[in-house]
Amino acid sequence: MLYPTQARAEWVVNHPSDGPMELDYKKRETLERWTWCDALYMAPPVYVKLYVLTGDKRFIKFMNKEYKATYDLLFDKDERLFYRDSRYLTQKEANGAKIFWGRGNGWVLGGLAEMLQDFPKKDKNRKFYEDLFVTLSERAAKLQSPDGFWHASMLDPASYPSPETSATGFIVYA
């Protein structure tokens, strides 16, 4: 399993997409980038692990570049949460709050938990990810419902009143 994964990751690193970061399902090139927050669970831990296994700095360099591009677009510094993707940057919930998906932010926290297990302790970028993990964890903790769950909408629990078990699972895992 390692060799096909490594071969694909090497191809991606050697042929980085110059597609836009704004998600548009009609444009294939936007799916080549980490244009939705869920991708921060799917890809970065793999690139960190490949760096650890091979020592090839291209993997961690690529991961840092793509992660920060996603962070720059989707992380709201005021709310300290990630938008699901660029389509949500201007949308609001019924209560007027910005839309931040519980599951999406859970994906990010889960990805950070996985990455930080292997991320080199002396790497200059480690502090960015540690700080982000703490920031996002503290914010998520404040948004937990009294019943112990999180909701699909982190700032408008009434919009989806049922508990969001996948968000809760990811956040608790992290």
Please provide the spans of the model-predicted regions.
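Glycan-recognition and catalytic cores of secretory/periplasmic carbohydrate-active enzymes
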Residues: 1-174
